[in-house]
Swiss-Prot record:
The record marks 406, 417 as: Microtubule binding. Induction: Cell cycle-regulated expression with higher levels during mitosis. Forms a dimer. Binds to microtubules (MT). Bundles polymerized MT via the formation of 25-nm crossbridges with centrally located endocytic MT. Microtubule-associated protein involved in mitotic spindle formation. Keywords: Cell cycle, Cell division, Coiled coil, Cytoplasm, Cytoskeleton, Microtubule, Mitosis, Nucleus, Phosphoprotein. One of its GO terms (biological process) is microtubule cytoskeleton organization. It comes from Arabidopsis thaliana (Mouse-ear cress). Belongs to the MAP65/ASE1 family. The modification Phosphoserine is found at residue 500. This is 65-kDa microtubule-associated protein 4. InterPro entries: MAP65_Ase1_PRC1.
Length: 677
C-alpha cells in the first residue's frame, strides 16, 4: 500500500511538472514578465497547499471521532461497572487492532453490561415503589427516591438492602402514626365537647379520610393540622375560660353590690364554680360554648346597666356637691366644664363610670383642700367687693339732689352714708392688704388666684387704675373750682357782686345814683378811689381763703350738696348790697343771706358752683367784637390794678387756661346795666 501511495505521488508530481512546463510556454508566448510569472506560481503553490491541508484536517477529524466513540464506550462500561457494585471490567482489545476494530469490541462488551443493569433496575424499582407509597402516606419527602430512580447511580446489592431496611422503618412509622392520630382525635373530641363545636365537621375539614377508621391519612401534614387544631381549641378554651371566670367575678361583684336574690344566682351556679378551676379540670359539656358565654354576658350587661344607672345618680350628686363647693368658693372647676366629665360622656362610652366617679371624688378632695387655703382670702375679697358696692351706692347717693329731704327712713339713709364713708376711707388699705395676701398665695401654690374665672390681682389692678383716675379728676376739679373762685372774687372786688333774682315778690331797692356813677366812672379807672381798691383787694383775699377752707372742708367730709338751693346763692350770682362804693365793700359770696338756711352756703359743693357758673344759657358774656387786646388778669387779688385812662377801652373778657380749658367769667347785674356786655 505504501508503494502504491508512492507511485501515486510520483505520478502526480510528473503530471504537475508537465502542466507547469505548458504554463511556462504559454506565458512566454504571451510575453509575461518574470515578476508576473513568479506571482502566478506563488498563487498556484498556495492553492495546492490549501487543498492538502483540507484533506489532512478531514482525516484528523475522522480519527478523533473514532477515538471519542471508543472513549465514551469505555467510560460507560466503567460507569455501569461502578453502579453495579464497583467490579473491574477488563477490556477485550488486541494488539495491532485499528481504531474501527477496537470500537467494535467496545460496543459488544457494552451491550452485555446494559442487560445486567436492566435486570438490577427491576429489583430496585420494586422496593422504590413501595417506599414512595409509604412516603406519600406518611407525608415524607420523595424527591431523593425519584432522583435515585432517574439517575441510577448506585445499583449495588448493598444499596438494595438499604432501601429494603428503609421500607421496614416506614411501615413501623405508619403504625405509630395511626396510634397518634387516634390520640389526637380523642383530645380534639373532648375539646369540641367542652367548647360546643362540631367534631366531625372539623376533622372532615382537615382530611376526609379521618372520618373512616380504615383509610385514615397519617401524613405529617394531617398530624400537624390536628396538632394546630388542638392548640387553637386549647387557646380558645383558655380565652373562654378566662372570659367566663371574669364574667363570674363580675357576677359575684354585681350580686353583692345589687343584693341579687339567691334564686337568680342559682341559674349561673356552674359558671361561678369554675372560677378556681384549671384548664384540665373543666370538662363539662358546653360549659364554654358561645351560647353559654352569651347568656352570662347578657346577665352581666343587664346588671351593669342597673349599676351604671345608680352610678349616674351618685355622679350627679357628686357634681352637685362639687358645683356647690365651687360656687361658694367662686372657683372655676375644669371638671365641670369638660364634656368628658358628664353623664353624656358615660352614655356615649367616652368615659368609664367608675373612673369618672373616682376623678370627681379626687376633684372634690382637691377643691376642698384648695377651698381651705382660699377661705381667708375670699373673706377679704368679699369684704372688698362689699366696700366697692358701698362706694358705688355712696356715689349714687351724693348725686341725688333730694337726699336731704325729710321723709320716712331718711335718718337711716344718713347713717348708712356715714358708715359707707368710713368704709370707703378704708378701701386703699384694704386693697393693699388683699394684694399682698393674693400675691403670697400665688407664689406659694404657683397658680393664679381666680374669682369666678377672673384673676383677683387683675381686678385689684383695674380698681387701682380707676381709683387713681377718679382722684386725679377730683384734684383737677378742685383746682378748677379754686381758680374759678379766685376769678369770681377778683371780679366782685373790682365791679361788685351780681344781684340775685328777687324771689320774694318784693321790689328790689334801687341803687343810689352816686354808687352807679362811681361804677360807671370805674370804666376809665381814673376816678376809682384807692381806698375802695384796697378794701376790695383785702376782701378778695379773705373770700379766697374762706372759699378754700369751705371747699377743703367739703372735700374732706364728702358731704353732698343740698337739693333745692337757690340760684342766687351760687358764687358769682350773690346779690350785692345797694350801697355806695366808697361807703361799704362788697360782701363775701359765702356769707349767709337773710331767710336762707344756716348751712346753705357752707354745704354747697364745688360741683354746684361749677355747674351754675358754667351754665351758658343763663350767663351773659361780653361781646368780643369790642376787644382790641386781651390781657390776663393776675390770679392774686393784690396784683389787680385799675386802668388809669378813661379813653382806654375796657377789656371785658378774661382769659385763663387751666388744663387747656377756657374759664369764662360772668358779670354782675350792675356791670351788665352799665354796658360792659
Amino acid at each position: 500500500m505504501i508503494r502504491n501511495s508512492t507511485e501515486q505521488f510520483s505520478r502526480i508530481e510528473t503530471t504537475c511538472g508537465l502542466l507547469l512546463r505548458q504554463l511556462q510556454e504559454i506565458w512566454n508566448e504571451m510575453g509575461e514578465t518574470e515578476d508576473e510569472k513568479d506571482a502566478s506560481l506563488a498563487d498556484i503553490e498556495k492553492e495546492c497547499l490549501s487543498v492538502y491541508k483540507r484533506k489532512v484536517e478531514e482525516a484528523s477529524r475522522g480519527k478523533a471521532n473514532l477515538l471519542k466513540e471508543i472513549a465514551v464506550g469505555r467510560a460507560e462500561i466503567a460507569a455501569i461497572g461502578s453502579s453495579m457494585g464497583g467490579q473491574e471490567i477488563h477490556s477485550n482489545s488486541r494488539l495491532g487492532e485499528n481504531l474501527k476494530e477496537e470500537l467494535e469490541n467496545v460496543n459488544v462488551q457494552l451491550d452485555g453490561l446494559r442487560k445486567r443493569k436492566a435486570e438490577r433496575m427491576i429489583r430496585f424499582n420494586e422496593v422504590i415503589d413501595q417506599l414512595l407509597k409509604l412516603s406519600l402516606q406518611l407525608g415524607n419527602p420523595t424527591d431523593y427516591l425519584k432522583k435515585f430512580a432517574a439517575e441510577e447511580t448506585d445499583l449495588s446489592l448493598q444499596r438494595l438492602e438499604e432501601l429494603r431496611s428503609q421500607l421496614g422503618e416506614l411501615q413501623n412509622e405508619k403504625s405509630k402514626r395511626l396510634e397518634e392520630v387516634e390520640c389526637l382525635l380523642k383530645t380534639l373530641n373532648s375539646l369540641c365537647s367542652v367548647l360546643g363545636e362540631d367534631f366531625k365537621g372539623m376533622i372532615r375539614g382537615i382530611h376526609s379520610s379521618l372520618v373512616d377508621s380504615n383509610t385514615r391519612d397519617v401524613s405529617r401534614s394531617t398530624l400537624d393540622k390536628l396538632d394546630m387544631m388542638i392548640v387553637n381549641l386549647r387557646e380558645a378554651k383558655l380565652q373562654r375560660m378566662q372570659k367566663v371566670q371574669d364574667l363570674a367575678v363580675s357576677l359575684l361583684e354585681l350580686w353583692n353590690l345589687l343584693d341579687t336574690p339567691a334564686e337568680e344566682q342559682k341559674i349561673f351556679h356552674n359558671v361561678t364554680c369554675s372560677i378556681a378551676l384549671t384548664e384540665s379540670e373543666i370538662t363539662e359539656a358546653n360549659i364554654l360554648s358561645v351560647a353559654s358565654i352569651k347568656r352570662v354576658e347578657d346577665e352581666v350587661i343587664r346588671l351593669s346597666k342597673i349599676k351604671i344607672t345608680k352610678i349616674k345618680e351618685v355622679i350627679l350628686r357628686k357634681r352637685l356637691e362639687l358645683e356647690e363647693i365651687s360656687r361658694k368658693m367662686h372657683m372655676a372647676t375644669e371638671v365641670l366644664k369638660s364634656e368628658n366629665f358628664s353623664v353624656e360622656a358615660i352614655e356615649s362610652g367616652v368615659k368609664d363610670p367608675e373612673q369618672l366617679l373616682e376623678q370627681i371624688d379626687s376633684e372634690i378632695a382637691k377643691v376642698k383642700e384648695e377651698a381651705s387655703s382660699r377661705k381667708e382670702i375670699l373673706e377679704k375679697v368679699e369684704k372688698w367687693m362689699s366696700a366697692c358696692e358701698e362706694e358705688s351706692w355712696l356715689e349714687e347717693y351724693n348725686r341725688d339732689d333730694n337726699r336731704y329731704n325729710a321723709g320716712r327712713g331718711a335718718h337711716l339713709t344718713l347713717k348708712r352714708a356715714e358708715k359707707a364713708r368710713l368704709l370707703v376711707n378704708k378701701l386703699p388699705g384694704m386693697v393693699e392688704a388683699l394684694t399682698a395676701k393674693v400675691t403670697a398665695w400665688e407664689n406659694e401654690r404657683g397658680n393664679e388666684f381666680l374669682y369666678d374665672g377672673v384673676r383677683v390681682l387683675s381686678m385689684l389692678g383695674q380698681y387701682k387704675t380707676v381709683w387713681e383716675e377718679k382722684e386725679h379728676e377730683k384734684q383737677r376739679q378742685r383746682d378748677m373750682k379754686k381758680l374759678h373762685g379766685q376769678l369770681i372774687t377778683e371780679q366782685e372786688a373790682l365791679y361788685g357782686s351780681k344781684p340775685s333774682p328777687n324771689k320774694s315778690g318784693k321790689k328790689p331797692l334801687r341803687t343810689p345814683v352816686n354808687a352807679a356813677m362811681n361804677r360807671k366812672l370805674s370804666l376809665g379807672g381814673a376816678m376809682l378811689h384807692q381806698s375802695l381798691k384796697h378794701e376790695k383787694a383785702t376782701l378778695n383775699s379773705k373770700r379766697t381763703k374762706y372759699y378754700d377752707q369751705n371747699a377743703t372742708s367739703r372735700r374732706d367730709s364728702a358731704l353732698p350738696t343740698l337739693s333745692g338751693r337757690r340760684n342766687s346763692e351760687l358764687p358769682g350770682r350773690i346779690r350785692s348790697k345797694n350801697v355806695p362804693v366808697a361807703g361799704k365793700a362788697a360782701r363775701s359770696p359765702m356769707l349767709r343771706k337773710p331767710l336762707s338756711p344756716v348751712t346753705s352756703n357752707i354745704l354747697n359743693s364745688p360741683e354746684d358752683h361749677h355747674k351754675d357758673a358754667y351754665t351758658t344759657k343763663e350767663r351773659i358774656l361780653t361781646p368780643k367784637t369790642n376787644e382790641e387786646k386781651k390781657r390776663a388778669v393776675p390770679t392774686t387779688p393784690a396784683a389787680s390794678v385799675a386802668m388809669t385812662e378813661a379813653t382806654t377801652p375796657f377789656t371785658p373778657a378774661v382769659e385763663k387756661r387751666m388744663d387747656e380749658e377756657d374759664v369764662i367769667v360772668e358779670y354782675s347785674f350792675e356791670e351788665v346795666r352799665a354796658g360792659f356786655c
